[in-house]
């Protein structure tokens, strides 16, 4: 809950604002796909490292079960919301990575209580959806690049 309130929710608000401010050719039904630079990737990775370290200690303080996979979930979640904010197609793969981590976490829980298997199935479907989302965003980026004469 702390990760969602302290990280995911604020980043989702920033992402919404970013998407509303960058419609594709003025068409509010489609966002302008963004390509991030190598320098931005470096900044993103440094920020991700800092957030991961911070939340590791927060999760450890609260005696979180499965501390390592839970921390990795924070990492992938932060990458996903950052890339969503930046309008990069890679956000979908980051969410997919987060789904994979959550599949592991819920599978561990399901070993103790089989009723959690339904949650595992749910995250498997989220993973499929995120993979399709990445494919769709790549197609949209290609269409936008072909339609824009000065696109790189």
Give a label for each model feature.
Residues 1-2, 57-66, 108-118:
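Helix-coil boundary and interhelical linker segments in multi-pass alpha-helical membrane proteins
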Residues 6-25, 138:
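Membrane-water interface of transmembrane alpha-helices
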Residues 18-76:
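Membrane-proximal helix-loop-helix units in multi-pass membrane proteins
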Residues 84-152:
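C-terminal transmembrane-bundle signature of multipass membrane proteins
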